[in-house]
């Protein structure tokens, strides 16, 4: 009984802590960005190293802020919603599958959503954190894929 409980807990913690690493290696449909989604959903579990220009906020929602020179961009996750504020001040609302719901300028007027440009900005905001994720000692990629494959395809 204790062995099964211990193995279950280990598996749970492994999948949560290494979810970003696993998400980088899961086959997925273009535009779904599983590594970004897993980073934001599991930020309380994932490795969040000290990186110059990057700060983390986890008081009710999870947010990563990147300051580069005088420009600031923020990716926030709350409930089932991702919200990105670009360095230009535009805001983008996504569902948990990374599908854009709204695109607004700094005056809250609807603007055209330029997928490649916005995803590039989001990637620039969080990529240093994604790059810092450790490789698991015991790789459970097969189990992660089994659980999340349908979500990202």
Regions found by a protein language model. Name each.
Residues 4-82:
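N-terminal export/targeting and maturation segments
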């Amino acid at each position: 009984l204790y062995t099964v409980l211990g193995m279950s807990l280990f598996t749970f913690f492994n999948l949560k802590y290494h979810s970003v690493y696993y998400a980088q290696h899961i086959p997925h449909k273009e535009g779904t960005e599983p590594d970004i989604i897993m980073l934001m959903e599991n930020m309380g579990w994932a490795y969040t190293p000290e990186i110059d220009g990057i700060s983390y906020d986890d008081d009710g929602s999870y947010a990563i802020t990147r300051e580069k020179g005088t420009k600031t961009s923020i990716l926030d996750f709350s409930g089932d919603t991702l919200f990105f504020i670009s360095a230009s001040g535009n805001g983008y609302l996504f569902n948990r599958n990374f599908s854009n719901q709204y695109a607004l300028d700094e005056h809250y007027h609807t603007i055209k959503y330029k997928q490649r440009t916005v995803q590039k900005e989001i990637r620039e905001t969080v990529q240093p954190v994604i790059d810092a994720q450790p490789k698991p000692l015991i790789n459970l990629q097969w189990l992660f894929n089994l659980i999340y494959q349908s979500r990202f395809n």
